[in-house]
């Protein structure tokens, strides 16, 4: 095994590991001992990318579950993102922009963090404090359900009430969309938060409420959200 102290990709990305090698640091012998394991890991990643299968990656029922996240950047039929699916998302975004005042995403783990990361990158912490013009008409965005935090739910609900009062001269009802995200449809934290917001919004004359559930659409799965 030979090392050039630098890895250069065609994209121009350069990883310089010169200072990682040497006395008191990583030795060539250390990496040589790991070569077989690294080759095995490389083969597993290549298999996952080509077939969508990963060793011992199972659903809750014990059956193999496909792993397709490596295909997300490639927009084509047969991949998670297709021209048709992306157009649906764009149409959905246009609908939210023109019809919805606030969106509350409800999920645990990846169902929570995936959207939250995109929000933090694209919008930032001051988004919900901006006026409609600065938000270019897009709704305010909130996240809940990552844990059973009644205080956090109440804080978001109070903020929705605040904005609904300030929107009253412009429109009779403040439109809220709830988006519970759970493949099984039975995630406790997600359902608890969803029920809280759904009941709180429907009890008030200030709100119109819509629900868009992200869940398993297979009737045999029996998702309560479907």
Model-identified regions with their sequence ranges:
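Extended, charge-enriched "interface" segments that sit outside catalytic cores
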Residues: 1-97
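Glycine-rich phosphate-binding loops that contact phosphosugars or nucleotide phosphates
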Residues: 94-226
């Amino acid at each position: 095994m030979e090392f050039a102290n630098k890895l250069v990709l065609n994209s121009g990305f350069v990883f310089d590991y010169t200072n990682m090698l040497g006395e008191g640091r990583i030795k060539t012998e250390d990496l040589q001992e790991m070569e077989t394991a690294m080759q095995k890991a490389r083969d597993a990643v290549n298999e996952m990318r080509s077939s969508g299968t990963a060793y011992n990656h199972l659903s809750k029922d014990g059956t193999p579950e496909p792993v397709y996240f490596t295909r997300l950047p490639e927009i084509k039929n047969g991949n998670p993102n297709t021209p048709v699916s992306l157009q649906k998302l764009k149409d959905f975004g246009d609908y939210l922009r023109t019809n919805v005042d606030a969106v509350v995403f409800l999920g645990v783990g990846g169902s929570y963090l995936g959207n939250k990361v995109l929000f933090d990158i694209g919008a930032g912490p001051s988004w919900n404090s901006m006026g409609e013009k600065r938000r270019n008409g897009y709704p305010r965005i909130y996240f809940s359900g990552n844990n059973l935090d009644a205080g956090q739910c109440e804080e978001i609900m109070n903020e929705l009430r605040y904005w609904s009062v300030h929107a009253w001269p412009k429109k009779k009802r403040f439109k809220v969309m709830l988006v519970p995200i759970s493949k099984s449809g039975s995630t406790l934290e997600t359902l608890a938060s969803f029920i809280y917001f759904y009941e709180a919004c429907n009890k008030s004359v200030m709100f119109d409420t819509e629900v868009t559930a992200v869940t398993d659409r297979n009737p045999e799965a029996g998702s309560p959200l479907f």
